[in-house]
Amino acid sequence: MKTAVLMATYNGEKFIEKQLDSIKNQVLAPDYVIIRDDGSTDGTVEFVKDYIATNDLVGWNIIKNQKNLGWRLNFRQLLIDSQNTDADVIFLSDQDDVWNLKKIKKQVEVLSSHSEIEVLSSDIEFNVSTDQAAIPKSYVFSDNAKELSKFPINRFYNVGFRQGMSIAMKKEFIDRFIKYWKEDYDLLPHDSLIQALAGLLEVGYNLNETLAIHNRHAMNASGRHDVTLKSPKKFHIQELYAKHQGYYEIAYKVLQDNNSSLAQVEKKYYEFTKRRVAN
């Protein structure tokens, strides 16, 4: 199985080297590493270019976005980029974490030996470096003493069993949903979308083994909250559209393609959310 790592960067010059090292030094080296920078104002792009050249890394590439997309759409674009490779398994990466050197090997072994699994997360360790860091809660699988735990079915978008940087997935899973993810659904987190869909389709599992260290600090994009109770009404409407409606439309269409009995349930949520946005 060929592999590709997708990494989103933004002003990560101070943090990125350890993550790059942990990917470069994998026991099973990735065939491709695609990095998209979202308009960094520090030396991130130059640092990565030098790193690739110095280490003579074939299949590694950094692309600088023409405009700032935001981390959600940056990952969406990376998923689209992955479709232009012949990789079989796609890994998601943040810019400031550290992978176990057997991460790629272990997740590929599971995916290659289990045809029923299309999305595979893993356990992670949290390293909190500042008081301002947001510490996400980890979902506890009831059967976590086993090697693998299946994602439960959750009909709502805001599901997160593990952080996105723990996820490996088969390319055909991306094929299921990427065509339905519109650019104006720009508040939809990629990791929540992937895990929710994998649960609904019953193709998502967690490898109950710690395979990465997830660093939490004040600069983590996922730790920032965009809309609050004090936000103007127009921002709440935009969130309803770009996050909730977006998720339910994608879920409905993916389930419909799969002839799932859950498609009509998600369709009702989709139509209800559309009415809320319109009113």
Regions inferred by a protein language model and the residue ranges of each:
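Generic detector of well-ordered alpha-helical segments enriched in charged/polar residues
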Residues: 49, 153-154, 174-178, 238-241, ...
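Nucleotide-sugar donor-binding/catalytic module of glycosyltransferases
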Residues: 1-231
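Helix-centric, low-specificity signal for extended rod-like, repetitive segments
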Residues: 12, 96, 100, 236, ...
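Solvent-exposed amphipathic alpha-helical surface segments
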Residues: 55, 85, 114, 250-261
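Catalytic core of nucleotide-sugar-dependent glycosyltransferases
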Residues: 146-147, 214-218, 223-260
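Membrane-interface aromatic/basic loop that binds lipid-linked glycans or pyrophosphate carriers
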Residues: 253-279
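Short linear sequence motifs
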Residues: 3, 68, 240-241, 262-265
